[in-house]
C-alpha cells in the first residue's frame, strides 16, 4: 500500500485506519511557537459512519486506502441484497443492508448512484442528490393552511418518511434532497 506524508493529506482523501477505510473530512496544520509541528484531522469511517479526530506529528505517514468510487445504476432489491450495474461494462455487484448506508430508503429502481468499492466489494452507496418519489400516505391539507406554516409527515413509496408542507397531498410526486432527507419541491 502507498503511504502519504502529513503535508500531502487533504480533505476528501481516503485512508486506512486500523485496516478500515475512512474519508478525511477536516485537516489543520498547526505550527506552535515552541515544539514540533503537527496535523490535526477528522475522518469518517466509510462503513460505520463514525467520525474520529486524530492528531499526528508532521513527520508521520498515513496509508492510502485502495478505494474506488464508481458510477453505477441501481437495478433492484431481492429483500436481502441490493443489485447495481456498471452502465459501461454491464458488470453487476450486490451489497447487503450494511453496505447501503441508509441509501435504500431513497432508491426505487434505475437511479444512478456512486458505489464505493473496497477490494472489489461495495462498502458504501451514495444515492443521487435529489430523487422524485410519490407520496403514499399523508394527512389531508385543511383549508386555511399556508405554505409558511409548519408541516406534516408523509410516507413515500420507498417507505421513507419526510416532513412536507401542509399543501402537499397524497399521490403527488415530490422532490427530496437525499443528503438532508428534506422536502425540496413538488413535481408537476
UniProtKB/Swiss-Prot annotation:
What pathway annotation does it carry? Protein biosynthesis; polypeptide chain elongation
What stretch or stretches form a coiled coil here? none
* Modification after translation: May be beta-lysylated on the epsilon-amino group of Lys-34 by the combined action of EpmA and EpmB, and then hydroxylated on the C5 position of the same residue by EpmC (if this protein is present). Lysylation is critical for the stimulatory effect of EF-P on peptide-bond formation. The lysylation moiety may extend toward the peptidyltransferase center and stabilize the terminal 3-CCA end of the tRNA. Hydroxylation of the C5 position on Lys-34 may allow additional potential stabilizing hydrogen-bond interactions with the P-tRNA.
| PTM-bearing positions, type N6-(3,6-diaminohexanoyl)-5-hydroxylysine | 34
Major location (coarse): cytoplasm
The family database entries (InterPro entries) matched by this protein are listed as: Elong-fact-P_C, NA-bd_OB-fold, Rib_uL2_dom2, Transl_elong_fac_P/YeiP, Transl_elong_KOW-like, Transl_elong_P/YeiP_cen, Transl_elong_P/YeiP_CS, Transl_elongation_fac_P
Single Gene Ontology MF annotation: translation elongation factor activity
UniProt KW keywords: Cytoplasm, Elongation factor, Hydroxylation, Protein biosynthesis
Q: Name one Pfam family in it.
A: EFP
Biological process (GO) annotations held by this record are: peptide biosynthetic process
Quote a single Gene Ontology cellular component term.
cytoplasm
Per UniProt, subcellular location reads as: Cytoplasm
SUPFAM superfamilies per the UniProt record, alphabetical? Nucleic acid-binding proteins (SSF50249), Translation proteins SH3-like domain (SSF50104)
Which family does the record assign? Belongs to the elongation factor P family.
Question: Which NCBIfam families is this protein grouped with?
Answer: efp, PRK00529.1
Q: Which HAMAP family match?
A: EF_P
What does the record give as the function of this protein? Involved in peptide bond synthesis. Alleviates ribosome stalling that occurs when 3 or more consecutive Pro residues or the sequence PPG is present in a protein, possibly by augmenting the peptidyl transferase activity of the ribosome. Modification of Lys-34 is required for alleviation.
Annotated protein name in UniProt: Elongation factor P
Which species? Xanthomonas oryzae pv. oryzae (strain MAFF 311018)
Lineage, opening ranks? Bacteria, Pseudomonadati, Pseudomonadota, Gammaproteobacteria, Lysobacterales
Amino acid at each position: 500500500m502507498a503511504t502519504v506524508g502529513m503535508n500531502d493529506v487533504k480533505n476528501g482523501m481516503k485512508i486506512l485506519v486500523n485496516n478500515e477505510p475512512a474519508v478525511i473530512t477536516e485537516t489543520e496544520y498547526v505550527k506552535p511557537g515552541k515544539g514540533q509541528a503537527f496535523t490535526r484531522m477528522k475522518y469518517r469511517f466509510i462503513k460505520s459512519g463514525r467520525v474520529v479526530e486524530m492528531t499526528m506529528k508532521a513527520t508521520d505517514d498515513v496509508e492510502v486506502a485502495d478505494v474506488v468510487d464508481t458510477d453505477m445504476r441501481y437495478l433492484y432489491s431481492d429483500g436481502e441484497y441490493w443489485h447495481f450495474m456498471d452502465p459501461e461494462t454491464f458488470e453487476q455487484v450486490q451489497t447487503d443492508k450494511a453496505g447501503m448506508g441508509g441509501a435504500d430508503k431513497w432508491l426505487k429502481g434505475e437511479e444512478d448512484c456512486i458505489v464505493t468499492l473496497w477490494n472489489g466489494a461495495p462498502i458504501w452507496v451514495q444515492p443521487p442528490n435529489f430523487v422524485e418519489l410519490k407520496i403514499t400516505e399523508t394527512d389531508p391539507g385543511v383549508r386555511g393552511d399556508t405554505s409558511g406554516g409548519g408541516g406534516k409527515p408523509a410516507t413515500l413509496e420507498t417507505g421513507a418518511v419526510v416532513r412536507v408542507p401542509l399543501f402537499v397531498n397524497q399521490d403527488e410526486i415530490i422532490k427530496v434532497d437525499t443528503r438532508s432527507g428534506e422536502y425540496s419541491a413538488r413535481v408537476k
